[in-house]
Structures are given as structure tokens and as C-alpha cells.
Amino acid sequence: MSNMDFLPISKEDLKKRNIDVLDFIIVTGDAYVDHPSFGTAIIGRVLEREGFTVGIIAQPNWNNIEDFKKLGKPKYGFLVNSGNIDSMVNHYTASKKKRHDDFYSPGGKSGYRPDRAVIVYCNKIKEAFKDSPIIIGGIEASLRRFAHYDYWDNSVRRSILEDSSADLLIYGMGEKPIVQVSNLLRYGMKIDSIKNVRGTTYIEKDIFSLKDYIEIPSFEEVSTNKKSYAEAYKIQYYEQDSIRGKTLVQKHKERYVVQNPPQPPLSQEEMDEVYALPYARTYHPMYEAEGGIPAIKEVKFSITSHRGCYGSCSFCALTFHQGRVIQNRSQDSILKEANMMTNMKDFKGYIHDVGGPTANFRHRACKVQEKHGTCKNKQCVFPKACKNLIVDHKEYLSLLRKIRKIPNVKKVFIRSGIRFDYLMYDKNDEFFKELCEHHISGQLKVAPEHISDKVLNLMGKPTRNVYDSFVKKYYDINKKIHKNQFLVPYLMSSHPGSDLKAAIELAQYIKKMGYTPEQVQDFYPTPGSLSTTMYYTGINPLTEEKVYIPKDQKEKRMQRALLQFSIHDNYDLVKEALIKAHREDLIGNGPDCLIPYNKPYKKSHKKNNAKNNNNHYNKNNNKNKDISKKNKKNSLSKHKKRK
């Protein structure tokens, strides 16, 4: 592919297109990948469709002001995002250790973007072009639009609008608001006059002219009072709906952060249009010499069938970004994309995914949402299925069947995550059977996350009984279709509410599973999630009940070690945890013991595991022993895929 297949990145590109001045310049923390899995590509192509000229400055050197000047000053302004992931999550692990790789950068190497990329980029743009409007968006800006707890600073930070000095913030999925804002700018409106576009947040000196709004506790209150923080979050959480959501206001000293209600979800026709835009569907050629951009490998032959999720897991901030209402593409749109993939030169016959945040949520949760919006005080599938929930996999199944019939398609996988409780609510087993028969390759990854019901309740996840029923049914179906396939559970340690007792309960369950999972993630307090609010305040903001928070680093290490108790290097921590919890009954050589009395030699320990001694593995281990190696993912990937 040539540079002309991409949006312009240099003055040379502008000359070839006879462009003197760009309308907009997108500055992003990711490398430039022109694929609909990347927000920069979507916003760039949407604006191009509307008749605007758009350039890309990808991963500029933040220590060199000239990098921000290389495309000149745009006519209407700069659009700034950190990339597909919050820059701090991208750079640091849950234990705040620096990551050494970056799937969104050339060659997978780190160091191409600064911490708090949105703030840094905005400050540099202001330095280069003092009066140029700046609009921020993407996940980093979206989830930091109000005063928020910042795990890396261990303090409450102001709205990112204050820290970045940006003129406007677009939150959530930005196609509709960016078109409306850009057209207003084209018609001559000044950026500081744009205050009525849904899906935007701005700063106001006074709020006398506002109507029908809710003022939440101020930055000064939430940064000094945890009850006020919890109260502010609760209001934000309940008002993220395009039909019933109110304008929200939060005072920051003498100014006000104002969030307009969310944009209505995209219609099916609008979704189809977005995904039919002329993407190059790969990374820019300038990265070829550095080994390309690793992130494209996972998505190049994957299809986004829908957006949104009504699962409402507490540790996921999707409600604040994509929303609870499902927005799906038509089958024709998806089939066209699948057919197009088969003509790509490096297509090997495998479509890696057809899904979204949760693969089997292909339609709205209920008919009520269409007229009244999402319910304010209850969830669709938690703690149990709502009576109005539409449980039906027929349309999704028919789509998968059609894709399977496309010439040159050998296999269609589902990797974006199956919500197992929703699957169990379906009385028709047809989808479950075909899922096992056609859409997994030896193993299915699911996310029970924990096994203690008190922790699951705080996570917003179904009870242990639901997962146990799913596991039994999964293996029963595989037995009937004569397939020897396994489950790989995602598990989380140190979530709010998880004490040593709960971690030991999970360790005992893992022992019965028969192998040590590598898919273990420490809870990561990222901006915008309900669980992060619990972590910071020690309060469940929805119930106002106190929550136990494992913040001590030693205890967090113990909890993680318990989930991988059979790993030799974890022996001392596991033993210390069991003694601290007064569970010495789990130390010894009995069938229920997690570890022996004495720490074995490392080689002997491995040999014991393989021989099934000490009961660290059950009879399934020989079949299952290679699962962890084949599925090793970095913790960023695990964080994104949880359902």
C-alpha cells in the first residue's frame, strides 16, 4: 500500500493532495493504524466523509515542539487522544511497574508516548499554536471528564479539561458529536460557544443559563471527603443514558465542568456507514522497517458486530464510554466485511472474532430501552436476569452460519468473550452446541473472575452456582459432540471485598479445577469504574455499604499467590497467608491441602505436579497442561477482554 491509501501524515502528503491547510489534525498516542478498531482511524474517516481534510500526527516527540508543527496550523483545530488505551494503563502494570512493551507502537516497543498523553500533547499544542482550538476525546479523556481518583498518583485529580486546557471534550463514541461540532465550526461558530452538543463536556464560568441539571459534589469536596466522592460517582453512574440522563455539573474552584447528556446510540444504518468507510485496514507503511504494529495482528481479521454492553461488571468502565445500549451492524454489512477479508493477500481462512465488548450481546436488552432508556436503579442481568430481558441467540447464530458458508472461510472464532450467564438463560441449546462445535479451538475463555459470592456480588457478576452449571453443561455438550475441549477461566485477585478468606476459597476451587491458571489479573483501579470508586472510598456508592479493600501490598501478593498456589516460588507467601487466616488445615499432604508441610525442591515440585502428587492437579491435567503456554497474554490484553 502507498501513503495515498492513508490520511496525510506529512507536508509531502499534503502537496500530493493539493491541500494547503488542513481542517483538522488528529494527534494520537498510538501509531497510525487505519483500521476501524482504532478510534483515530474512525474519526479521521468520518470527518473525511463529511468533506473535511484531516491529517494525522501519530506519537509525536513530546520533547520537540517541531513535531507538533509538521502539518502546520489546522483551520478548525486539533483533535487529541491518548490512543486506544489510557496511557497510564498502557505504561504500568496493576502493581505500578513499568511495562516494557507496547502493542500499539512500532515493533511493540515502549517509550513512544508520554505518561498522561492527552495533557502533555495539549500543552505542547498550546505552546506551538496558542489560539488553535483543541478538542479531546478517546478513552483517556472520556473516563477522566469529572474529578476522578487516580491510582498512579493515589489522589483525586481534577477533570482532564482543567489539566489539559482543552476547549472541549467529546466523551463516549465520538462519531456523532464530532460531526456536529465540526459542522458548527465550519459554519463560523467559535469553539467556546459550542455548549449544546450531546456527548460533550466543557468548562463554564457560571451556570445561570443552564436548565434541568444536577450539580454533583465539587472537586474540592470529592478530593477531601470520600463520602462525597461516592455520592458524585453514584450520580454520574445513573445519568449516563441518552433518554433520561440529565446535564451534570461539577464545580472546580470558581469554574464549572458541564457534561451534556449522552448522544443517542448509533442506528444500525449509521453503524453500517461507519464500518464501510475506506480504511486501509493496516498500519501505515512508515512502520514497516521497525516491524510494524503488533496490535493489528489481533484485529486484522476480526469483525466488530456491535458496540455497548449491559453486563455492567463493576470493574469495567464501559458504561461510561460505550454505554449499556447495544448498537449493532446489519448482517449484510458484516458479511460484506467478511467477504472482503477473504480477498486480502494474507488471509489464511480464519476469521478471529465476530463480536463486541460481549460477543453474545447482539441486540438491545429489552424493548423498554427503546422508549424509556436504560433502567436507573437496576441492571439487566445482575443479580439475576430482569423479567424484560430478551434472551435469544438466534440472530447471532444465523449470522455465524452465513459467515461459515463464505468461500475460503475455514473457521470463524469467537474471541471477544461470551457472557456465560446470559448463555445459560437461553432455553434453546442450539447456539451453545454450535459454539462448541464450530467457534472455539480446543478451549473457551470465560470470565467467572471469582468464586466467592460476596466478592462476585461486588463485581456485578453471577453467583458461583451459575458458573458451576455452565461448566457442567459445557463439558456435557462437548462430550455429546465428541470433542475434547477445555475452559480457561479469567480470575481476579484483590478486588474490593476480597479478603484472605475469599482468596483461599478461590484457591480451593482452583485445586478442584485441576490446573494452575496463568490467566490471573490483580484488580487494577482504572478511571471511571464502580470498583475503582469502592477501592478509593471503601464504600459501595450504589448501596452506601462499607467494603473491605485489600490495599496492603503484602496481602495483595498473598492473594495472587493463593490463586497460583502450586507454583514453587509462591510457596512461602501461600504458607504465610494460610497461617495468617488460621487455615493450617490446608497445609500438609491430605487430599484437600494446598501445599505440603515443607517447601519442596524446585525440581521435585515440578515432578510432583506432573505425577499428580500432592493433588495439585486432577485427572484432567494431562489433557490440559499446555493450555497456559498456548494462551499466555500480557496483562493489558487480559484487562481488555474480561466479560
Swiss-Prot record:
Keywords: 4Fe-4S, Iron, Iron-sulfur, Metal-binding, S-adenosyl-L-methionine
Domain Radical SAM core: 295-566
Similarity comment: Belongs to the UPF0313 family.
Signal peptide start and end residues: none
MF terms in GO: 4 iron, 4 sulfur cluster binding; catalytic activity; iron ion binding
Ranges of compositional bias, category Low complexity: 610-621
SMART domains cross-referenced by the UniProt entry: Elp3
Species the sequence originates in: Clostridium botulinum (strain Okra / Type B1)
Keyword Methyltransferase: no
Cofactor(s) named in the record: [4Fe-4S] cluster
Segments of this protein annotated with the region Disordered: 598-643
Descriptive protein name: UPF0313 protein CLD_0573
Cited SUPFAM superfamilies: Radical SAM enzymes (SSF102114)
Annotated [4Fe-4S] cluster binding sites: 309, 313, 316
InterPro entries hit by this protein: Elp3/MiaA/NifB-like_rSAM, rSAM, rSAM_horseshoe, UPF0313, UPF0313_C, UPF0313_N
Domain of life: Bacteria
Basic residues: bias regions: 600-609, 630-643
